[in-house]
């Protein structure tokens, strides 16, 4: 069983997205570079007053932000941007109940990407890289966006067709592109702000990931529960209060539960509670028993065709 720690770095990424919007709205980087270049000028204070207008920009308050994907990160960005006075539009046809509950009531849930493209001044992407999302931001999508849009991508680099993006930047269709993924296409372009994959590079994110990983592994070892596995489904029966508990990793094929209950029946063991979850080719079964599990039961379960691993938890 392989675990991951989704959402542990969500706040770190959220803060970087907000910083990206601010940097794209006002030429803060250009201003800092100008001061560094002119640092030896005796009248730098007076020069600064004369030159500051070239670094002027706009405020994000009152602007429209479109968020594609309202998972852990997208939802946090939505709430924070709304608190900063932005008009936030969210698109996510697969939004979870937990994510929906965490969203501010001020967030407008949009049912079409075209609405995001046509209405929003800023668009940020927070979706996984799938066959269906690869290069979802292509020439067709870019053509539908408002002139002067700011596009942010802190999810996956391949979500954006970068050749089409460069054309849109050069034509002025896109004002700025902010991304966390450096490559030869985007690095050095005057309209692109690139960070070196800093999304989760905070002490807090690293600590959160470590704590979450320890909790997941401990719960699996002590109780047999699975949370946030890459290759197996989420499956939990809490803390075992019965006489025994057995967990079984097996192939996701018909007839497995019948075979397991037959083994228990032949051993004269009553099952007080049971759950089974499947994910792709694999499944996971947990059984609480009214008597302790024995090595004979384990051997009988392991002999069932399709069983990968049997563990006695208690």
Which positions does each model-derived feature cover?
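N-terminal Rossmann-fold NAD(P) dinucleotide-binding loop
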Residues: 74-75
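Rossmann-like adenosine-cofactor binding region
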Residues: 93-185, 201
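Short beta->alpha connector loops at strand-helix junctions that form conserved
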Residues: 1-8, 155, 197-199
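Phosphate-coordination loops involved in phosphoryl transfer and adenosine-cofactor binding
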Residues: 61-64, 139, 148, 243
